[in-house]
Amino acid sequence: MRVRPFFNDSSWRRANLVTPIVRRKRHSYARLQSADAQLPNLIQIQLSSFQKFMDEGIRRTLEDISPIEDYSGSYAVEFGEHRFEEPPVSIEECMSKDKTYAAPLFVRVRFVIKETGEVREQDVFMGDFPLMTDWGTFIINGTERVVVTQLVRSPGAYVMEPKDPTKQVLTASLMPHRGSWLEFEVETKGYVSVRIDRKRKLPVTVLLKALGFGGPEEILARFGNSWLIRNTLERDDTTSREDALLEVFRRQRPGEPVNLENAQNLVDGLFFDPKRYDLSEVGRYKVNKKLRLDVPRDVHTLTIEDIEGLLRRLLGIAEEVAEEEEFGRINYERIRHKLDEYEHFGNRRLRTVGELVQEAFRIGMYRMERVVRERMTTQDEESITPQTVVNTKPVASAIKEFFGSSQLSQFMDQTNTLAGLSHRRRLNAMGAGGLSRERAPIEVRDVHPTHYGRMCPIETPEGPNIGLIGQLSTFARVNEYGFVQTPYRKVEDGRVTDEVEYLSADEEEEYTIAQANTPVDLETGRITAETVLARSRGGDVTTVSPEEVDYMDVSPVQTVSVATSLIPFLEHDDANRALMGANMQRQAVPLLRSEAPYVGTGMEFRAATDTGDVLLARNAGTVERVTASRIVVRREDGGLDEYALRKFARSNQGTCVNQRPLVKEGEEVEAGTVLADGSSTDQGELALGKNLLVAFMPWEGYNFEDAIIISERLVKEDVLTSIHIEEYEVQARDTKLGPEEITRDIPHASDDVLMNLDADGIIRIGAEVSSGDVLVGKVTPKGESEPTPEEKLLRAIFGEKAREVKDSSLKVPHGEGGVVIDVKRFSREAGDDLPPGVNEMVRVFVATKRKIAEGDKLAGRHGNKGVISKIVPEEDMPFMEDGTPVDVILSPLGVPSRMNIGQILETHLGWAASKGLGENGGEPVFVSTPVFSGATVADINEAIDKVRRNGAAEVGMSGGGKVTLYDGRTGEPFENKITVGYMYILKLLHLVDDKIHARSTGPYSLVTQQPLGGKAQFGGQRFGEMEVWALEAYGAAHTLQELLTIKSDDRVGRVKSYEAIVKGENIPSPSVPASFKVLLKEMQSLGLSVKPIYDVEAVSEEDQERRDWDEAARALGINISREEPPGQLDDTPDTFSRGGM
């Protein structure tokens, strides 16, 4: 959810560098003081990547493609430096007028005539380039989008376990960023084969000869007289380099004419041509590192050393295995540490926004290259200029295509602040160049040890995408090659230093790393334990002495993502439920009055401030003026900073985006002070739900199957009320019969309908509307045809007579309504940019207050979700000794089997916090209990005891945190003591008002003639096969007939039934449904002549008559049989056209 003022000046870029200042101090239960390594900016992954692209990426792509020469080599086009101009339109205007927030890109282009050396130079406009906003999103056609980071396999050299161990022993592959794959396979029969681009295999020595490794002796000498190579040479029939080249050509291009030149070109083109083969910088780095080579970094094609090095590594491992085990029966667990695996984070890298956009830009430039070549050839030398020869359409369309339709450019999730933050930190293994849902193996989806501190092991979707979409861990960052790094504190001789180093998964394996909660002397930094639990080299967990430790975790939070780190007592929850908890926080609706949790984790502040949803002061100063929509701060140097607040805007998901000032006039502020709250924050902290008093007890069976009972107080006092904003749009177009018109003059409209419309037929702001009300009056001309020229002339002379128009007004859809909060009007006359054929457009925003209702979904932060089954009056709810009724009743059976005990601990600590932890005069205190190092059971017991001693005795709380509750209806106490306390409850976006739906008459499908399905189509309820069986089992024949005919696809029957209902007559008996006729047609299409028979007696009489005629004809010798005309299988009259076809 983007909530920042819209300044179109570059100084705004500085705003993100301000360090936010905490407003609310929490009582902390943290057992560890984290190192000085503060959290990095949580959306840095987006911002820095795009900045790098702007600074270097464009320049690099232009250098790669430059120069473009024509086919004869006489002309060249070179690309020089580039520059961006200021965006012509502000972010706010882009959002209201459906424009893209972009800056014009200009590139210096030189056209060179090689013969004369003449150079013509010009700045060429390369199109508008979408810009990233300061909070890491893009505005494309007026909607906010996020480019998700892609998780892909890194190019490089790999030796891996084979897919089929009965055929191969090991496989090795050289994977480029772009180009042909080279794969080596050690066969169980004891030789080595090679595949290029997954084509047919050939002995590896054939390729080696073709690449110029020499004859058999030289090859053997190069590979240390390996027996595998000797076996391979025995299978190799080629005798010379030329033979080998021709053999490679035959395997790669079967059926093409073979000659030596083509063969040499093929091999050179496959691996050594920079245009067709690109290892990329990352690939070269990985290959050099893995094979211990020192090929220069800028060589991005394969070299002979790469191929030799990979083969050496493969042969070394294979021969070592052969010494101990027989090929075909190998225990791979024993040699796993020597092999590479796809899931290892040293072999997977991130393609961040910048790289993805750069790839789209490169594709556009290469498309443009072809056009430029053709133009240089066809145009006249005198008239050619850079402007005429460069066509920028392909570049603009490639960029547009990426932002508009790439799988990784997504409609931003703005349900609340956390949803937007999580979306920007998402890692997606799918998309172009990634995996597909169907082909992704289990291993890729699984948690891997190298995820530690890099990708969250908990937060991932539950459906078919599980494990393919992840979240960046809190402290993780991305290095220059796209590998994820995580921070560790350096340990020297058993003493922990304050030096923090970021390590990638590859580097980490060479060290021994201790946990964050290793006991350390705060004064000296020495590790006090005699033995330390640590991950040793290679990743196994062991105990070591303090002197052996090289690094130590920075914080226990570094393993999990932001959403997961917001779950208190995460360590007491089962992982499956924690996953649901993390995911459901992203679906929480911002409430009317936001409230931070009593029991937090200390991450709430950074999670809210880094997203740009709260307003931070850019400079220190004094607040001079505060209104609901503006804050003015006078800086210390005397200048003014003005901040615009967003008021009641609609998010992508229809929730409300609103900012409220927190400062008062005259208040002194520092740089980074929180000036205004967003819609789901409170005092600058993330606030997704409400602290409610819950009791764990059954109540009349209403909390069966996780259902929830709530008090009517939550409805009356708007505790769980949220605002939702819907947008409706109408366009007045040009039609064949004339233009549509937005007007108050609607045919056959009563005064009641027009009551809230202004003179132009547009609803006034503040009007309350319900379903069916007119929002914008619009009429469309109707008529059989265009008027003749004579008619037009008469009309021109005598003036326009009332033309035939039909009402096509914009009305509030079925089941919706609310208060009109804003109207935006755009017209061609006012100079607005509208789609072709549209003269005028009106947008109406309608806000609804949604109170909590039965059927709404509530959830805690521990995956404890349920649907409200009953709203009980306050006086009937169970109450405590002091008369306080509880707000929510949850089922106790939902806890043990789900193993999310965190909710119970939260409830106990929440109760103590609500009473000020026995201090603070009984006023609530906000506490923080960080994940994996927060409050213990002893801490909670101590807090409860303190509250019991200091002033909350009247509640009757016992030592274990339980109370006696009394039945609100009878006043009798319940038999057993009950756990009661404060839990943070979220209202989720799955609201009953959006789901409830009923249909009387509505649209039908053209194909099947059955009602459409779904609320959006105003469809019916599907009465499926199993439901039909149920009615058949009860013998409810008439009910079933009605459901299958007049309520479904009996076209005539349904019209007659409607007529009968209107006239108050009995409903006639149904006729044949359309689906039966489809079945008939299908059978006829199989050549079966299916003829419906209606009147059996009439048919038998007809048959008898026909037999009599036949006998008479035979007696007279007359042939009265006739051939059936070809192509007409069914010659019966359509006897059931009475039933309506």
Swiss-Prot record:
SUPFAM superfamilies with a match to the protein in the record: beta and beta-prime subunits of DNA dependent RNA-polymerase (SSF64484)
PROSITE patterns membership: RNA_POL_BETA
Family annotation (InterPro entries): DNA-dir_RNA_pol_bsu_ext_1_sf, DNA-dir_RNA_pol_bsu_external_1, DNA-dir_RNA_pol_su2, DNA-dir_RNAP_su2_dom, DNA-dir_RNAP_su2_hyb_sf, RNA_pol_bsu_bac, RNA_pol_bsu_CS, RNA_pol_bsu_protrusion
One biological process term in Gene Ontology: DNA-templated transcription
Listed CDD domains: RNA_pol_B_RPB2
Gene Ontology annotations for the cellular component aspect, listed alphabetically: DNA-directed RNA polymerase complex
Keyword vocabulary terms for this entry: DNA-directed RNA polymerase, Nucleotidyltransferase, Transcription, Transferase
Coiled-coil features, chain-numbered ranges: none
Gene Ontology MF terms: DNA binding; DNA-directed RNA polymerase activity; ribonucleoside binding
Domain of life: Bacteria
The EC number(s) this enzyme carries: 2.7.7.6
Gene3D superfamilies: 2.40.50.100, 2.40.50.150, 3.90.1100.10, DNA-directed RNA polymerase, beta subunit, external 1 domain (2.30.150.10), DNA-directed RNA polymerase, subunit 2, domain 6 (2.40.270.10), RNA polymerase alpha subunit dimerisation domain (3.90.1800.10), RNA polymerase Rpb2, domain 2 (3.90.1110.10)
S-S bonds: none
Residue ranges, annotated region (Disordered): 1117-1141
UniProt catalytic activity: RNA(n) + a ribonucleoside 5'-triphosphate = RNA(n+1) + diphosphate
Function noted in UniProt: DNA-dependent RNA polymerase catalyzes the transcription of DNA into RNA using the four ribonucleoside triphosphates as substrates.
UniProt record similarity statement: Belongs to the RNA polymerase beta chain family.
Quaternary state and interactors: The RNAP catalytic core consists of 2 alpha, 1 beta, 1 beta' and 1 omega subunit. When a sigma factor is associated with the core the holoenzyme is formed, which can initiate transcription.
Name of the featured protein: DNA-directed RNA polymerase subunit beta
Naturally occurring in which organism (per UniProt): Rubrobacter xylanophilus (strain DSM 9941 / JCM 11954 / NBRC 16129 / PRD-1)
